[in-house]
Curated annotation (Swiss-Prot):
Domain of life: Eukaryota
Protein name, UniProt field: Malignant T-cell-amplified sequence 2
One annotated GO molecular function: RNA binding
Residue span(s) of domain PUA: 92-171
Lineage: Eukaryota, Metazoa, Chordata, Craniata, Vertebrata
Family of this protein: Belongs to the MCTS1 family.
PANTHER family named in the record: MALIGNANT T-CELL-AMPLIFIED SEQUENCE 2, MCT-1 PROTEIN
Organism annotation: Mus musculus
Subcellular localization, as worded in the UniProt entry: Cytoplasm
Note: Imprinted gene expressed from the paternal allele in blastocysts.
GO cellular component: a single term: cytoplasm
UniProt keyword annotations, A-Z: Cytoplasm, Transcription, Transcription regulation
């Protein structure tokens, strides 16, 4: 999604949000990520300006004080950025890939089923279309944010094809866009 994303070329405009819109976004975030509720006022303080950065391909990035927090495409679900996920790793369920998959994930490839079922990988129960943080064997922080394309039980049974779609990974265009003022 952000493989060829460039801040100078991809950003079209930036809009400061009204309080009523911010409340709606906060309720959508608590509905989507139940574990985030106690931390939401710390992530998005009431007095700080909340802006939406609009980008090409109908991408919207939610920022607070210039810090990129969440993004979404069209009016779809919000995804946390990796920078936010590294601060609050508990907001998403985790899946773990083995060491052999790391270089492919960091180049933007989707996570294949064998990378989730081999020794060193850990596959936790998750339904289809669940937003997950993809961790790596022996690493502390998430490599990417992805969406389950198969249920965990199906990944173990079938063990072929794409298991998790890679949405945002370390060193992609969004990762390099550190802040937006």
């Amino acid at each position: 999604m952000f493989k060829k994303f460039d801040e100078k070329e991809s950003v079209s405009n930036c809009i400061q949000l009204k309080t009523s819109v911010i409340k709606g976004i906060k309720s959508q975030l608590t509905e989507q990520f139940p574990g985030i509720e106690p931390w939401l006022n710390q992530i998005m303080p009431k007095k700080d300006p909340v802006k939406i950065v609009r980008c090409h391909e109908h991408m919207e990035i939610l920022t607070v004080n210039g810090e990129l927090l969440f993004f979404r495409q069209r009016k779809g679900p919000f995804y946390p950025t990796l920078r936010l996920l590294h601060k609050y790793p508990f907001i998403l369920p985790h899946q773990q890939v083995d060491k052999g998959a790391i270089k492919f994930v960091l180049s933007g490839a989707n996570i294949m089923c064998p990378g989730l079922t081999s020794p060193g990988a850990k596959l936790y129960t998750a339904a289809v279309d669940t937003i997950v943080a993809v961790m790596a064997e022996g690493k502390e922080h998430a490599l990417c944010v992805g969406v389950m394309k198969m249920a965990a039980a199906d990944i173990e049974k079938i063990n072929k094809g794409i298991g998790i779609e890679n949405i945002h990974y370390l060193n992609d265009g969004l990762w390099h866009m550190k802040t937006y003022k």
